Amino acid sequence: MSNTMQGAHYPQMAFDPTWQMHPAYATATAFNPYNVSFDFTRSPNTSGGSDESMSDGSKIDPKRSPKYLEKRMKNNEAAKKSRASRKHREQKNQTENELLKRKNAALEEELKQAKCELAQMQITIRDMSIEREAYRRENEMLKMVNNKFADSKFEPPQPLRDMTNCNLPYKYELLS
């Protein structure tokens, strides 16, 4: 199991200073406080020989391994693709935002005009209502006058007929 964790197959891990703040750090370093090593490329089970003894070709630099380089190339391509898609999405959102702002301004102007038209229509309706009420009152008065003449035997005066009616005997006598 320790063979799978040897540094020859994995890239060197970056140093993270926050791990020293973990509560288990004090326990781990209590037994050997003077021999703290941050080199995780070698297993503690191997002999502490020099690097020349391992340079017989069995140890490959993790930064130069083909798998690592291929992984980095794929990651770089994915990052470029992600950046391009994000830029495209942001540009699309920006143009859509500008379009919506223009539409909103046009709708606000249309709303303003509609409110003005509504106010004018309300004034016209009020004036027409007042005029209608005046006509209704006048009509009621005329009906009352008409009913007054219809109920009585009195015939309303008609000056034109009276002037031209030749059946009246005193027609010419009044002129003398």
Swiss-Prot record:
Biased composition (Basic and acidic residues): 58-80, 91-101
Residue spans of biased composition, Basic residues class: 81-90
Region: Leucine-zipper, residue numbers: 100-107
Record-annotated bZIP domain positions: 65-128
Transmembrane segments: none
Biased composition annotated in UniProt, kind: Low complexity: 47-57
InterPro entries on file: bZIP, bZIP_sf, C/EBP
Pfam families documented for this protein: bZIP_2 (PF07716)
Region (Basic motif): 67-92
Protein name: bZIP transcription factor 8
Species name: Caenorhabditis elegans
Gene that encodes the chain: zip-8
